[in-house]
C-alpha cells in the first residue's frame, strides 16, 4: 500500500483514535479501523462489505473517513460501493445527509457522492443535486457523474438548471461534462434553458434513460463546437488544463507516411519510422517527433484565448521530468511567450517516466483536464540501463491520483507500437478521457 499523504494521515489518526466512532466492540466499524491500523487492504475491503451488510451510523462514518484517508484504490472502491448500499437503508438517510453536508474535506464529499452514484435508488438525486453548486470543482464534477450513473429521469432537471448557471456558452470542462451527461440521459443537446424546460414538460412522463439508444442522428438545438483551439488536430475543449509532453530520446525518430518503411541495418528489419540518429547526439531533425511536438505545442500556446488557464509538464528521465508552473496560469501575452520559450529550449532525455509525469500533472492546482502526449511505454533508468515500469502500476497510480480530483485525462500517441497504443488507450479510458493516434505524418 502507498504511504499516506500528510493531510490524509492526520485524518486517519483522528479516526484510529476512535474520537468519532462510537461503535460496539466487534462491530464492522471497529473491524475497519483495526484493519486500517494494520494497513491490511483485504481486511479493510472485507470490513467495508460487512458494514454494507449491517449498516449503522458508526459504520457510515468509518467508511467516509477511512475511505478518504487510505490511499488505495481497492479500499476506496470498497468504501464507495458500501456507501451506496448503506443509502438503501431508509433509517440512515438522515445521518447520510448529515455526514455529507458536514464533510469539510472535498475528498470526503467526493467519496460520498461517488457512493451515491452506485445506488439504484432515485432518492439519491435530491441529496446529490445541491452539490452541483459546491465551491469545489471536483465535487461538482463528481455530482454530475453520479447523477448520470443513476440513469433516472429525475437527474435531468438539476443538470440543465446547473448548465444554465454555468452558461450554455461556457467552454469550461464542467459545461462539457453537463452537456455530455444530459445528452446521455435524454438524447438532447439544447443550448437554451427555455428549450430544456419545454422539452422536459412534454417528455418527463415517458423518458427512461435506461432504454435510450444513441446514434449519430440524435438531435437537439445544435451540437456544440466550442474549443480553445487544436493541437495535432485534436480539439482542446477545456479552459483550465495541463499539457504533458514526452521528451524521451525515442522522440528523435521520424515517422513515415502510411505504407512506407525504412530498413534499419542494425536491427535488420523494416520499421514504420526512420532513426537517423540512434545515439541521440545530433540536433533533432525538423520532421522528428520531437520537433513536430515542439511546433504543435508552440502554435497552440500562441493561439490560446485570454480566458484559458494552463500549465505544462515535460517528462523523460527523473531529473528531466518537471513542471513549468505549479498552478494553471492565465494565457496572457507574457505567460504565453514564457511557455513558448520553455518548450523551444527543451532537449530530449533518456527513459520515459510516465509515472512521475502523472504525479506532476495531477498536482497542478486549478486544472480540470490533462492532455497527455507520448510515444512510448513507461520506462526508468536502473543500474545504467533502461527498464520497463509495469504498465498496470502506472494505470493504477493514475486512478489513485484521480480518485477525488476527477480530471479528464486525454492521451495522444505518436507511436507505431501496438503495446504503447494499448497502454495509452487504457490510461485514457480509466480516467474519463479519449485516445487519439497522432503518429502518421502527411506526405
Which residues make up each language-model segment?
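VWA/integrin I-like adhesion module and closely mimicked acidic/polar interface patches used
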Residues: 264-268, 344-346, 376-431, 436-438
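Short inter-helical turns and helix N-cap capping residues of alpha-solenoid HEAT/ARM repeat scaffolds
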Residues: 39-40, 71-72, 104-105, 135-136, ...
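Amphipathic alpha-helical scaffolding segments comprising HEAT/armadillo-like alpha-solenoid repeats
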Residues: 24-35, 56-68, 88-101, 121-133, ...
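Conserved hydrophobic register position within alpha-solenoid helical repeats
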Residues: 47, 79, 112, 143, ...
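Acidic, polar low-complexity linker/tail segments
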Residues: 23, 197-279, 326-328
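Residue-level detector of extended alpha-helical repeat arrays and alpha-solenoid scaffolds
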Residues: 44, 60, 75-76, 109, ...
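Von Willebrand factor
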Residues: 107, 169, 285-294, 298, ...
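…and closely analogous acidic/polar surface helices at protein-protein or active-site interfaces
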Residues: 239, 250-312, 328-335, 347
Amino acid at each position: 500500500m502507498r504511504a499516506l499523504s500528510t493531510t490524509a494521515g492526520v485524518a486517519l489518526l483522528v479516526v484510529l483514535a476512535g474520537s468519532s466512532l462510537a461503535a460496539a466492540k466487534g462491530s464492522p466499524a471497529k473491524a475497519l479501523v483495526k484493519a486500517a491500523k494494520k494497513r491490511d487492504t483485504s481486511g479493510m475491503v472485507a470490513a467495508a462489505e460487512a458494514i454494507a451488510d449491517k449498516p449503522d451510523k458508526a459504520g457510515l462514518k468509518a467508511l467516509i473517513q477511512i475511505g478518504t484517508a487510505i490511499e488505495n484504490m481497492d479500499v476506496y472502491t470498497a468504501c464507495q460501493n458500501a456507501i451506496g448500499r448503506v443509502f438503501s437503508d431508509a433509517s440512515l438517510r438522515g445521518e447520510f445527509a448529515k455526514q455529507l453536508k458536514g464533510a469539510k474535506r472535498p475528498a470526503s464529499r467526493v467519496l460520498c457522492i461517488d457512493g451515491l452514484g452506485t445506488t439504484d435508488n432515485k432518492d439519491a438525486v435530491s441529496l446529490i443535486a445541491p452539490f452541483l453548486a459546491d465551491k469545489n470543482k471536483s465535487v461538482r464534477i463528481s455530482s454530475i457523474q453520479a447523477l448520470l450513473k443513476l440513469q433516472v429521469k429525475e437527474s435531468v432537471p438539476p443538470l440543465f438548471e446547473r448548465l444554465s448557471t454555468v452558461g450554455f456558452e461556457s467552454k469550461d470542462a464542467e459545461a462539457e461534462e453537463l452537456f455530455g451527461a444530459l445528452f446521455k440521459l435524454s438524447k438532447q443537446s439544447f443550448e437554451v434553458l427555455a428549450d430544456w424546460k419545454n422539452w422536459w414538460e412534454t417528455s418527463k412522463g415517458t423518458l427512461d434513460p435506461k432504454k435510450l439508444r444513441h446514434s449519430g442522428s440524435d438531435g437537439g438545438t445544435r451540437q456544440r463546437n466550442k474549443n480553445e483551439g487544436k493541437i495535432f488536430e485534436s480539439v482542446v475543449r477545456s479552459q483550465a488544463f495541463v499539457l504533458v509532453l514526452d521528451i524521451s530520446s525515442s522522440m528523435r525518430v521520424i515517422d513515415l507516411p502510411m505504407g512506407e518503411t525504412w530498413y534499419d541495418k542494425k536491427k535488420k528489419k523494416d520499421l514504420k519510422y526512420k532513426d537517423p540518429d540512434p545515439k541521440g547526439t545530433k540536433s533533432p531533425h525538423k520532421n522528428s517527433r520531437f520537433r513536430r511536438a515542439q511546433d504543435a505545442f508552440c502554435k497552440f500556446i500562441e493561439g490560446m484565448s485570454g480566458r484559458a488557464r494552463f500549465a505544462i509538464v515535460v517528462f523523460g528521465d527523473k531529473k528531466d521530468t518537471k513542471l513549468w508552473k505549479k498552478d494553471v496560469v492565465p494565457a496572457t501575452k507574457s505567460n504565453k511567450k514564457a511557455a513558448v520559450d520553455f518548450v523551444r529550449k527543451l532537449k530530449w532525455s533518456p527513459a520515459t517516466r510516465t509515472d512521475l509525469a502523472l504525479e506532476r500533472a495531477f498536482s497542478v492546482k486549478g486544472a480540470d483536464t490533462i492532455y497527455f502526449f507520448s510515444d512510448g511505454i513507461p520506462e526508468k533508468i536502473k543500474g545504467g540501463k533502461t527498464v520497463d515500469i509495469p504498465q498496470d502500476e502506472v494505470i493504477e497510480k493514475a486512478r489513485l491520483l484521480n480518485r477525488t480530483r476527477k480530471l479528464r485525462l486525454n492521451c495522444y500517441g505518436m507511436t507505431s507500437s501496438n503495446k504503447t497504443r494499448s497502454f495509452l488507450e487504457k490510461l485514457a479510458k480509466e480516467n474519463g478521457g479519449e485516445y487519439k493516434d497522432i503518429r502518421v505524418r502527411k506526405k
